[in-house]
Amino acid sequence: MDIILLIQAVIMGIVEGITEFLPISSTGYLILSADLMGFWTKEKVDLFVVVVQFGAILAVIYDYWGRLWQALMGLLTGKAEGMSNPRQLGLSLIVATIPVMIVGFTFADEIKAYLFNPIVVAIMLIIGGLLIFYVENRPKAIIAEEAEDVSLKTALMIGLLQCLALIPGTSRSGATIIGALWLGVSRKASAEFSFFLGIPVIIGAALLDFIKHRDVLTSSEDWLVLGIGTVVSFIIALLCIRLLVAWVSRRDFKIFAWLRIITGVLVLIAAWGFGYQMAG
């Protein structure tokens, strides 16, 4: 049993749990962390990075179970306690999910082959940071105070913006939260709609990648490493979800814009100056 490998799995789970719902690209930080620690082989890191997100999204399901159940019942029966428009949230999430499912399933291999390099990641980190500054500094007219108020048109726009997250370094949370803010959704509703939208997307991607590449797990230790990372990401994400919701009700996202830009510049320096190539 490699204790160092298990410790690295814990660290990777912590990184995932912290970064998954922040607008900073959790995948980018996971791969950078794996490279810095010399964590696992390339094939196993590729699988780990996708599957460990399952733990983080389980935290959303756990924390919002009552609300998600009401949304599901509203969608199926047209009745949900405390919802004036019971079907709205469920329909909006379906509409917002369709674009990324189509684009993701169609171009996933091409994106991984041609866009998964440090230059693309760095550029998208920097562009994303600049866009956060732009959205945060423009006047906002709120059209949706709660996630249940997001219209189908707005949901479709958020779903189209989520497709940008297929480009490495963009951040699914960044594209959806900042995109929702730009479209006039309140801060709290933007964060929560992004949380909910991640459920079908992340679960679908994790299951698909696991089914396709589970043969890279060749020992019980491999399964243990993946399991530890997933459990740790669940625990840390559960804490971070609550902190983020509290944060967005009082502050903006500019600190994350700076973090994206600084990280992007450092990755560019590493790539151009030292020939750095991402393991993923």
Swiss-Prot record:
GO molecular function terms listed in the Swiss-Prot or TrEMBL record: undecaprenyl-diphosphatase activity
UniProt keyword list: Antibiotic resistance, Cell inner membrane, Cell membrane, Cell shape, Cell wall biogenesis/degradation, Hydrolase, Membrane, Peptidoglycan synthesis, Transmembrane, Transmembrane helix
InterPro entries for the chain: UppP
Enzyme Commission number(s) from the entry: 3.6.1.27
Domain of life the protein comes from: Bacteria
UniProt subcellular location: Cell inner membrane
One matching Pfam family: BacA
NAD recorded as keyword: no
GO biological process: cell wall organization; peptidoglycan biosynthetic process; regulation of cell shape; response to antibiotic
Main localization, broad class: membrane
Membrane topology according to the record: Multi-pass membrane protein
Entry GO CC: plasma membrane
Reactions this protein catalyses: di-trans,octa-cis-undecaprenyl diphosphate + H2O = di-trans,octa-cis-undecaprenyl phosphate + phosphate + H(+)
UniProt KW Membrane keyword: yes
Stretches that traverse the bilayer: 3-23, 45-65, 88-108, 115-135, 150-170, 191-211, 225-245, 255-275
Role description: Catalyzes the dephosphorylation of undecaprenyl diphosphate (UPP). Confers resistance to bacitracin.
UniProt-listed HAMAP family: Undec_diphosphatase (MF_01006)
Family, per entry: Belongs to the UppP family.
Protein name: Undecaprenyl-diphosphatase
